[in-house]
C-alpha cells in the first residue's frame, strides 16, 4: 500500500471537518481496524497484517487542531475545576450528569490526573470509604467489599480509573492536564470586594521555570464559577486559597490539623462551600482554610465533598453567570 502524499493544512482531519466539542461524534471502533474485529486479526499477524498508511503531518494536525479547538471552545467556560484529584473528578462527574449543557473545564497540573487516589494509605492497594460514601461507588458502578460501617475497593486505581473514564466520556467536559493555574481572574464588586471570574493558566513546565527563564506570559479562561480542589498545601496544593490570602480576601489560612478521621470527614463535606463569590472550595484544600483535621487514608469525604461542591455550584450558577457578563 502506497504511503499517503502531503496533506493540505486546511484539509479535513481523518476525512471529516473538525467540529466543536459538543458536535464531535464517536467513530465506530471498527473504522480504526479497517473493518476487522479482533477475532479476525487473531493469530494472523504474518498473513498480510499492516497498519493503515499515514503521513506524519496528519498525526500532528490531528492533535493540534483538536487541542486548539478545545482552547478556543473553553476560553469561555461555565465552570472551571482546578485539580483533578478524587474530589475534583467527583465534582466533574456530578456536574456532567446534572447539567450536560454546561461547558466544564478541568485544569490539572500533573500529566496524570487522579491526585493521590491511585493508591490507598502508605502506598497500599486497597481504598477504604466510610459509609454513606458507598452510594457514590454504587452510582459509578465500582465493586467493593462491605465491612459494615465502611467498604473496601480492592484497588484504589479501580475507583480512580472508573471515575476518570466516566468524566472524560462527557462531551461537555474537557481535561487540560500538564496545565497549572497561576492566578485567578477577578472583578470588583459593588461593595468593594472581589468576585472570581476565571483562572490564569500556563503549561506546568513553564510555571516551574519562571525563576530561571525570561517572562513567559500565561493564558486565561473566563468562567462564572471556579471550583478549587487542589488538596493539601504544597507547590501546587491549596493554591487558590493561598492566593485569596495574598489578595487580602481572607485574613489567613487556618492550617490543617492532625489526623482525626471521625471529625475530619464530616467537617470537609459539611463545609464545602463558596468561599468568596465565584470560588467554591472542596476537599483537603478546605482543611487549609478552616484549620480542619486531616482524615488520612479514607476517601469517602473526597467523593462526597465533590458531590456537595457540584450542588453548591449549581445553587449560585445563574446568579454568578449574570454577574460575569463583563
Curated annotation (Swiss-Prot):
Cofactor note: Binds 1 Fe cation per subunit.
Enzyme's top EC category: transferase
One term under GO cellular component: nucleus
Annotated catalysed reactions: [ADP-thiazole synthase]-L-cysteine + glycine + NAD(+) = [ADP-thiazole synthase]-dehydroalanine + ADP-5-ethyl-4-methylthiazole-2-carboxylate + nicotinamide + 3 H2O + 2 H(+)
One GO process term, biological-process aspect: thiamine biosynthetic process
Subcellular location(s) per record: Cytoplasm; Nucleus
Record flagged with keyword Metal-binding: yes
Name the UniProt record assigns to this protein: Thiamine thiazole synthase
Task of the protein: Involved in biosynthesis of the thiamine precursor thiazole. Catalyzes the conversion of NAD and glycine to adenosine diphosphate 5-(2-hydroxyethyl)-4-methylthiazole-2-carboxylic acid (ADT), an adenylated thiazole intermediate. The reaction includes an iron-dependent sulfide transfer from a conserved cysteine residue of the protein to a thiazole intermediate. The enzyme can only undergo a single turnover, which suggests it is a suicide enzyme. May have additional roles in adaptation to various stress conditions and in DNA damage tolerance.
Binding, substrate: 87, 108-109, 116, 181, 217, 232, 284, 294-296
Post-translational modification: During the catalytic reaction, a sulfide is transferred from Cys-215 to a reaction intermediate, generating a dehydroalanine residue.
Keyword vocabulary terms for this entry: Cytoplasm, Iron, Metal-binding, NAD, Nucleus, Thiamine biosynthesis, Transferase
Superkingdom in the source lineage: Eukaryota
Cofactor or coenzyme needed: Fe cation
Amino acid at each position: 500500500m502506497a504511503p499517503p502524499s502531503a496533506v493540505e493544512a486546511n484539509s479535513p482531519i481523518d476525512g471529516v471537518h473538525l467540529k466543536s466539542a459538543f458536535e464531535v461524534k464517536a467513530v465506530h471502533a471498527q473504522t480504526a481496524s479497517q473493518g476487522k474485529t479482533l477475532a479476525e486479526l487473531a493469530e494472523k499477524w504474518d498473513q498480510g497484517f499492516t497498519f493503515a498508511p499515514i503521513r506524519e503531518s496528519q498525526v500532528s494536525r490531528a492533535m493540534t487542531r483538536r487541542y486548539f479547538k478545545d482552547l478556543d471552545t473553553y476560553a469561555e467556560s461555565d465552570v472551571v475545576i482546578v485539580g483533578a484529584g478524587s474530589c475534583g473528578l467527583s465534582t466533574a462527574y456530578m456536574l456532567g450528569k446534572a447539567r450536560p449543557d454546561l461547558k466544564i473545564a478541568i485544569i490539572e497540573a500533573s500529566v496524570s490526573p487522579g491526585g493521590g487516589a491511585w493508591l490507598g494509605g502508605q502506598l497500599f492497594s486497597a481504598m477504604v470509604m466510610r459509609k454513606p460514601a458507598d452510594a457514590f461507588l454504587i452510582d459509578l458502578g465500582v465493586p467493593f467489599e462491605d465491612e459494615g460501617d465502611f467498604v473496601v475497593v480492592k484497588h484504589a486505581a479501580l475507583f480512580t480509573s472508573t471515575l476518570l473514564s466516566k468524566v472524560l466520556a462527557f462531551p461537555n467536559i474537557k481535561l487540560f492536564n500538564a496545565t497549572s493555574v497561576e492566578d485567578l481572574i477577578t472583578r470588583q464588586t459593588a461593595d468593594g470586594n472581589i468576585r472570581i471570574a476565571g483562572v490564569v493558566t500556563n503549561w506546568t513546565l513553564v510555571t516551574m521555570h519562571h525563576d530561571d527563564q525570561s517572562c513567559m506570559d500565561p493564558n486565561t479562561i473566563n468562567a462564572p464559577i471556579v471550583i478549587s480542589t487542589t488538596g493539601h498545601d504544597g507547590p501546587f496544593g491549596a493554591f487558590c486559597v493561598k492566593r485569596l490570602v495574598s489578595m487580602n480576601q481572607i485574613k489567613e489560612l487556618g492550617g490543617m490539623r492532625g489526623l482525626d478521621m471521625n471529625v475530619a470527614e464530616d467537617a470537609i463535606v459539611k463545609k464545602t462551600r463558596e468561599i468568596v463569590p465565584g470560588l467554591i472550595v472542596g476537599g483537603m484544600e478546605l482543611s487549609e482554610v478552616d484549620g480542619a483535621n486531616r482524615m488520612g487514608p479514607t476517601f469517602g469525604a473526597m467523593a462526597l465533598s465533590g458531590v456537595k461542591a457540584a450542588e453548591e455550584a449549581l445553587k449560585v450558577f445563574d446568579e454568578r453567570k449574570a454577574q460575569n457578563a463583563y
